[in-house]
From Swiss-Prot:
The keyword Membrane does not apply. This is Methionyl-tRNA formyltransferase. CDD domains: FMT_core_Met-tRNA-FMT_N, Met_tRNA_FMT_C. It holds the Pfam family Formyl_trans_N. (6S)-5,6,7,8-tetrahydrofolate binds at S115, L116, L117, P118. One of its GO terms (molecular function) is methionyl-tRNA formyltransferase activity. Belongs to the Fmt family. InterPro entries: Fmt, Formyl_trans_C, Formyl_transf_N, Formyl_transf_N_sf, Formyl_transferase-like_C_sf, Met-tRNA-FMT_C, Met-tRNA-FMT_N. Keywords: Protein biosynthesis, Transferase. Its EC number is 2.1.2.9. The gene is fmt. It comes from the Bacteria. Disulfide bonds: none annotated. It catalyses: L-methionyl-tRNA(fMet) + (6R)-10-formyltetrahydrofolate = N-formyl-L-methionyl-tRNA(fMet) + (6S)-5,6,7,8-tetrahydrofolate + H(+).
Length: 323
């Protein structure tokens, strides 16, 4: 016998493109009604990706939108109570919800998190997984409590990390996985078949918030570490270096595998340009050579090194040192 599920009244809390994808799927692929959206996203944010922004989705679908940095916690509490919400769904929201809000919805609050908890609790799980060379990550859906990402796990789905994944590409993969998992989890919550699994406290790591300073490339690190960070910080804050008073952003790089585990470049200062080539700029690091392939001069568009060198070859002379 086929069960007929009743649609829920949902309040959605989310800010990023990652959140927007989940919101889009909830609206267009479920029977549930999004009655209010709360976001930290500025209305001035321009569309920079193929994924609709939170604001655009709310406008197209005529859903109440609240920019929560203009509201106090008590005001948010009041709004949620008056809207008769069944469940709150939180995806990459950026602010901790108060204890009172967590207890208002009949079915509580659930959070979609971009890692296999308890690994990478915190605000930057996708970036930190890439930075640390993880080969596997995933999506966790948890029942929220008063602490950060510590609630019982309702659902988890693993996802392989490709050697070429950036935060942008991995976020897109996880958004696809997470949105499907979210629909399944809501159905289980309605049916009362969801199992709450406490997190394993023996494997906790924390994904600290990103900042622009850490995007400054430290050439004393190994080529492997630098390449990971370049992928982790794409599309924000974007790794960068300085040469001849020019700030250069690095969007893509490769490791020269032949240079790993060799000491033949120990006499060179890390950051020294070994050579330039149509396929990239070869730079000596604390261990190994990294090949910079896609760069962006300040105020210009990102471009492959092969094309960049036609206009800026004087910037990247052999044995110049990047800082």
């Amino acid at each position: 016998m086929k069960l007929h599920l009743k649609g829920l009244r949902i309040a959605f809390f989310g800010t990023s493109d990652f959140a927007a994808y989940h919101l889009f799927v909830l609206i267009h692929c479920s029977i549930h009604k999004i009655v209010a959206i709360f976001t930290q996203e500025s209305i001035k944010i321009k569309q920079k990706s193929s994924i609709l922004s939170i604001h655009t989705i709310s406008q197209i679908n005529n859903i109440l939108l609240f920019q929560s940095y203009f509201l106090s916690q008590s005001q948010i509490n009041h709004i949620i109570k008056n809207l008769n919400i069944d469940i709150i769904i939180v995806v990459s929201y950026g602010v901790i919800l108060s204890q009172e809000i967590l207890h208002i919805p009949k079915l509580g609050c659930i959070n979609i998190h971009g890692s296999l908890l308890p690994r990478w609790r915190g605000p930057a799980p996708i970036q930190r997984a890439l930075e640390h060379g993880d080969t596997m990550t995933g999506i966790s859906i948890i029942q929220m409590n008063s602490n950060i990402d510590t609630g019982d796990i309702l659902h988890s789905t693993p996802c392989k990390i490709s050697p070429k994944d950036t935060s942008y590409t991995l976020s897109k993969k996880l958004a696809c996985i997470g949105s499907i998992a979210l629909l399944k989890t809501i159905e289980k919550i309605i049916l009362g078949t969801c199992k709450n699994i406490p997190q394993d406290t023996s494997n906790i790591t924390y994904a600290y918030k990103l900042n622009k300073k850490e995007a400054h490339i430290n050439w004393n690190k190994s080529a492997i570490e630098i390449e990971r960070r370049i992928r982790a910080f794409n599309p924000w804050p974007v790794s960068y270096f300085k040469i001849k008073n020019q700030y250069i952003r690095v969007w893509n790089a490769e490791i020269n595998k032949n240079s790993i585990n060799t000491d033949q470049y120990n006499d060179f200062q890390p950051g020294t340009i070994l050579k330039t080539h149509p396929n990239g700029i070869y730079v000596i690091t604390g261990s190994g050579i990294i090949i910079l392939t896609v760069l962006q001069i300040s105020g210009k568009k990102k471009i492959h090194v092969k094309d960049l060198m036609n206009a800026y070859s004087s910037l990247f002379t052999m044995h110049s040192v990047l800082t």
